[in-house]
Amino acid sequence: MTTSFWPDGYQACFNLSFDYDSNSALIRRAPLDIVAQSRGKFAPNVAIPRILDLLDDLEIKATFFTPGWTIDQFTESCEEIVSRGHEMGAHGYLHERLAEISMESERGVFAKAAASFEKIEVKPEGFRAPYWLISDRTLELVQELGFKYDSNFMVDA
């Protein structure tokens, strides 16, 4: 008989997660492109409510990795995610490319995002880098700042 390393004899598990970017990356890249900006507003106005209803119907909990800017702009939808029992994880502030900024700037991104999470009374346990692009110091910062896990790597180990 094969022994499972999963708890209670389970043979597998999964984690359902979403990157709730809204238009955070678009604001940074194309602040004057109103057509692009309108695409980013689909998430808080249409997608998130539908996803939350579907998850409720299926009795599934998920993680929403969310930039601080999204929390600041769409606070109500973020509070709704939390009120329905889902986890929110940190995802930068304005969807920054962490590998392309200085250590000081990266620390600033984490600090600004933390302030946004404080507004909705959430201390995120997980972190996922925007674009899954980390610097050579990101993981050290994640650990230093007290996150319990990092969600950038795609392995089952």
Name each model feature, range by range.
Residues 1-126, 131-157:
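Catalytic alpha-helical scaffold of carbohydrate-active enzymes acting on polysaccharides/glycoconjugates
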